[in-house]
């Protein structure tokens, strides 16, 4: 089975493009590319109890903090985030970073990013309560 990537969803300056959605994998996994500009504001630390996340670096270097420990992920490197682990990420480098995220099982998809993107596009300071509500609806627990 081959697929083409869907449209890029913008969540602030971060771009998310799904490679595989749950409907294409029988719910086994979802996979998306994430483009993170230097010093971009990224998601608050969070956890998810229903799925794991595997990260594979494509370009630049992204720092994932998992349970308080930093993991630098560059091209060809990977990191695994188990269920329940508090984590977040930041691009501390001087170039944009891009990584592939694989979610298993495929319980997390584009709807989350679209909803957060709408909240952020409203203008003004981000509505943190609204963002946390979106996170909870999609199985993420803010830390």
PLM features per residue range, with description:
Residues 15, 54, 61-63, 70, ...:
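Structural motif
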Residues 114-143:
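Acidic/histidine-enriched, glycine/proline-rich intrinsically disordered or flexible terminal extensions
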Residues 33-37, 47-65, 102-103:
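Short, conserved beta-strand element in jelly-roll/cupin
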Residues 8-9, 68-86:
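Short acidic-glycine-tyrosine-enriched beta hairpin
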Residues 63, 83-110:
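Ligand-binding loop in jelly-roll beta-barrel domains
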Residues 9-45, 51-52:
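A short glycine-rich, His/Asp/Glu-containing loop-to-beta-strand
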């Amino acid at each position: 089975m081959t697929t083409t990537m869907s449209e890029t969803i913008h969540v602030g300056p971060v771009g998310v493009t799904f490679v595989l959605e749950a409907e294409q994998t029988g719910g086994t996994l979802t996979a998306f590319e994430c483009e993170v500009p230097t010093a971009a504001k990224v998601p608050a630390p969070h956890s998810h109890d229903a799925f794991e996340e595997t990260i594979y670096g494509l370009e630049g270097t992204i720092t994932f903090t998992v349970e308080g420990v930093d993991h630098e992920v560059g091209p060809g490197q990977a990191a695994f985030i188990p269920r329940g682990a508090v984590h977040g990420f930041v691009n501390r480098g001087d170039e944009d970073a891009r990584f592939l995220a694989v979610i298993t099982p495929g319980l997390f998809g584009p709807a989350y990013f679209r909803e957060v993107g709408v909240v952020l596009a409203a203008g003004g300071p981000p509505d943190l309560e609204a963002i946390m509500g979106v996170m909870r609806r999609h199985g993420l627990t803010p830390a």
